[in-house]
């Protein structure tokens, strides 16, 4: 069976209300639903789910490892439509309480990007690149760089 797309990204969070408020401000959209201890935010083509970390670990049948804040080799990314959008999103994240690790700047590969982490330590790249385009429904499409 082929998996056609990633449908939900779930982040285990220490404080559900804080995380819900943070992402509503950064993403500029209210949660679609927030009840029974989980928040769902609809994004084009996928959902962002926020779930209390201890409950998520219990649901998986594992334990929480106390390494929050250390870089684990995992990032999430948002592809912006312009360099200006990268800067605006980073400023929105900063004002919502994010820690900015890399200010908006030119990337070695010809794009423009920045990095921040949310209050739970998840790292995000906000990026624009000349090889990124969007379909009418907002899906990312890679093209030849000029």
Predicted regions and their residues:
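N-terminal beta-strand motif that seeds the catalytic metal site of vicinal oxygen chelate
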Residues: 1-20, 73-78, 130-146
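Alpha-helical elements of the RecA-like P-loop NTPase motor core of helicases
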Residues: 20-21, 58, 87, 102, ...
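Core segments of cupin and vicinal oxygen chelate
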Residues: 10-57
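Vicinal oxygen chelate
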Residues: 2, 5-14, 39-42, 63-146
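Short, hinge-like loop/turn segments at secondary-structure boundaries
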Residues: 49-50, 66-67, 120
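A short, acidic/glycine-rich surface segment
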Residues: 57-63, 133-136
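Short loop/turn positions at the edges of beta-strands in beta-sheet-rich folds
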Residues: 33-35, 80, 108, 120
């Amino acid at each position: 069976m082929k998996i056609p797309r990633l449908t939900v990204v779930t982040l285990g969070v220490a404080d559900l209300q804080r995380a819900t408020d943070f992402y509503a401000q950064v993403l500029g959209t209210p949660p679609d639903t927030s009840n029974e201890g989980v928040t769902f935010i609809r994004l084009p083509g996928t959902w962002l789910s926020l779930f209390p970390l201890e409950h998520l670990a219990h649901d998986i049948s594992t334990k929480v490892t106390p390494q929050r804040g250390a870089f684990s080799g995992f990032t999430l990314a948002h592809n912006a439509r312009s360099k200006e959008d990268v800067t605006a999103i980073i400023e929105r994240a900063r004002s919502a309480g994010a820690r900015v690790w890399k200010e908006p700047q030119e990337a070695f590969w010809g794009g423009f990007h920045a990095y921040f982490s949310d209050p739970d330590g998840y790292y995000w790249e906000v990026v624009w690149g000349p090889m990124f385009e969007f379909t009418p429904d907002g899906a990312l499409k890679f093209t030849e760089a000029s």
